């Protein structure tokens, strides 16, 4: 998990001195606050029922055994995803991953300076071997949004992020 290695973390801390940490949902400066108080109500409205699985009757899951989504893709959440994908904001993808670790796995978020760190969830045994982010087209933006979102999830679950085992086919 190189994202959370000492050198990477130090460089991000330095960046946050020059460019303070922002809310991925509304772009407000957060600094050392773990979450944005202005977005809490809007996010509560978009929150899904506390279930790890989306119902197959409502969503096409293909060959997947299950899938999870902490929010409906609308409003604040949609803006945050679009900010991460199209507005040169890789930090927004990481913040979304932190939020997913908190909501889907119950990870406590500890602030390390200005960086939110999801704590590993003790006793979590869901049978995960790794987190496999499905690559988005990162050639234009220079970073992979799903991979950035996966880093906090991997830290919370205690498994590696594997990025080199998928093959594009046409």
What do the predicted segments below correspond to?
Residues 1-170:
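Glycine-rich phosphate/pyrophosphate-handling loop used in enzymes and phosphotransfer proteins
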